[in-house]
């Protein structure tokens, strides 16, 4: 632990010393107020709504010029174990003589991330975001992402994924209903004898189901997007293109050393039995009337190339994108994948969502923001990769929402736990700032965040109802570092599981 703290301190000092900018605050509160008022005399090249102007306290705390932020990332989750990595950000705010200084969190942002997990997962990404590029109404965004996850989660597709976890205990033969995930997973990992040729298994071999809900997933992604603002910056029209190359490797019949010997309880080697992905794929191939893959035209068993044309229409009155305290964000986003977009698949995706932010206490009592999000996603097509069903793509700078479960959706449920053709999601948070300070020229603001997540998947719009909605409460902590970098710690508990996350960025 001391070594980790030492490495963190060295990294922090190096980042701090790289700043050319002096202290954030100019001097007295009166001087700061005078500078903010002077900003009103600067002329924008086009009209911007006053709703888009940053709050006075955000302007006072905003840095000028170029600066860098970043942190080593140490996380632990039940899927990947310990993850070690780093996220680095390079920002340019220009100075207070730039009229856009008072309307945007940054003029340029470069971001880089690299993470390596105990389970072998690797993530690397490069991003660039330039609002009001060349002092115009246009915004440019670019992304390059590589990821490989040997434990990518798959629990099926359709409303049947809403069923509570159940399993047959390999030791007693009893059926366990309403299981919690740790016990469910432990039972999968236990060894068992082969079930015979009817199941494609050798009765003389020792098998396990430890990877039943997992696939070995990899992706290369290149995405480019342009946005243009209308109505004094409130409306944004987005047009983008994305190429995504997906690799899928199944665990069926592979020897794994992650099995647990049913007699000794020790880790041992065994042959992986049929996975959930293969079972669903074969049911679709055989024309099973109950197969979700056959009913919904699901494909992508071996991965493939996905070419996407993306469009989005957004109404945005938030005051500060990375950490809003007021305003709303409304969005309709659409993705089209077809042969003419360079894709091996044929589908369309739609997302409608709204995010709302409102300060609920007087300024004298501190900054407390009530934040909420409501989202509805839909996917249809003649050949839909199963991986796309588990992603609600969004046109905004925040990107899509992996559904349903995990760090950005239902935080108390396993990642990818619920997936359907129609997805509904709601999140409510109370972001209450309780302390802020400046350390080594770095502005830090801390907030406590109780939250509630709710969601459900459906096979079609005609099936929509309010029964069997999945809910989890939770508590979190936020650190806003120089306003534009948000560190998030969340703990959530559900009927199935309890999970902790330490990641960058608000949930929404």
PLM feature spans:
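Extracellular loop and loop/strand-boundary signature of outer-membrane beta-barrel proteins
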Residues: 112-113, 207-212, 295-299, 336-342, ...
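Cleavable N-terminal export/targeting peptides
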Residues: 1-42
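Sequence/structural signature of outer-membrane beta-barrel proteins
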Residues: 91-95, 113-119, 133, 147-151, ...
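C-terminal outer-membrane beta-barrel translocator/porin domains of Gram-negative envelope proteins
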Residues: 299, 306-314, 318-438
């Amino acid at each position: 632990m001391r070594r980790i703290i030492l490495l963190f301190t060295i990294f922090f000092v190096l980042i701090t010393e790289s700043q050319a900018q002096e202290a954030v605050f100019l001097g007295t509160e009166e001087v700061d107020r005078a500078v903010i008022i002077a900003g009103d005399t600067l002329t924008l090249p086009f009209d911007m709504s006053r709703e888009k102007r940053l709050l006075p306290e955000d302007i006072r705390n905003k840095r000028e010029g170029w600066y860098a932020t970043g942190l080593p990332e140490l996380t632990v989750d039940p899927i990947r174990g310990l993850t070690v990595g780093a996220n680095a950000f390079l920002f340019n705010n220009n100075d207070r003589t730039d009229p856009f200084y008072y309307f945007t969190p940054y003029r340029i942002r470069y971001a880089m991330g690299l993470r390596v997990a105990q389970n072998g997962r690797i993530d690397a990404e490069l991003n660039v975001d330039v609002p009001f590029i060349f002092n115009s109404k246009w915004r440019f965004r670019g992304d390059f992402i590589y990821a490989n996850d040997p434990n990518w989660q798959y629990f099926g597709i359709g409303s049947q994924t809403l069923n509570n976890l159940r399993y047959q205990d390999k030791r007693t033969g009893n059926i366990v209903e309403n299981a919690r995930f740790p016990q469910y997973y432990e039972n999968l990992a236990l060894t068992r004898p082969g079930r015979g040729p009817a199941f494609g298994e050798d009765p003389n071999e020792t098998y396990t189901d430890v990877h039943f809900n997992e696939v070995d997933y990899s992706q290369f992604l290149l995405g480019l997007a342009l946005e243009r603002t209308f109505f004094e910056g409130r409306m944004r029209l987005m047009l983008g293109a994305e190429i995504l190359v997906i690799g899928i490797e199944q665990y069926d019949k592979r020897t794994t050393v992650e099995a647990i010997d049913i007699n000794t309880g020790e880790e041992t080697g065994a042959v992986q039995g049929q996975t959930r992905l293969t079972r669903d794929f074969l049911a679709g191939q055989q024309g099973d009337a109950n197969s979700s893959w056959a009913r919904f035209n699901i494909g992508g068993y071996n991965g493939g190339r996905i070419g996407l044309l993306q469009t989005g229409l957004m109404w945005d009155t938030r005051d500060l994108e990375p950490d809003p305290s007021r305003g709303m964000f409304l969005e309709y986003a659409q993705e089209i994948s077809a042969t003419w977009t360079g894709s091996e698949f044929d589908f369309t995706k739609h997302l409608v969502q709204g995010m709302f932010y409102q300060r609920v206490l007087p300024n004298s009592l501190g900054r407390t923001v009530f934040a909420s999000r409501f989202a509805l996603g839909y996917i249809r097509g003649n050949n839909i990769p199963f991986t796309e069903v588990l992603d609600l793509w969004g046109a905004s700078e925040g990107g899509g929402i992996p559904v349903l479960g995990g760090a950005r959706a239902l935080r108390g449920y396993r990642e990818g736990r619920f997936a359907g053709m129609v997805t509904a999601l709601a999140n409510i948070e109370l972001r209450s700032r309780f302390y802020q300070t400046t350390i080594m020229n770095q502005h830090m603001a801390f907030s406590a965040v109780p939250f509630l997540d709710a969601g459900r998947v459906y096979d079609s719009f005609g099936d929509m109802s309010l029964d069997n909605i999945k809910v989890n409460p939770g508590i979190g902590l936020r650190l806003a570092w120089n306003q534009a970098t948000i560190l998030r710690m969340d703990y959530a508990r559900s009927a199935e599981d309890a999970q902790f996350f330490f990641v960058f960025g608000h949930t929404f």
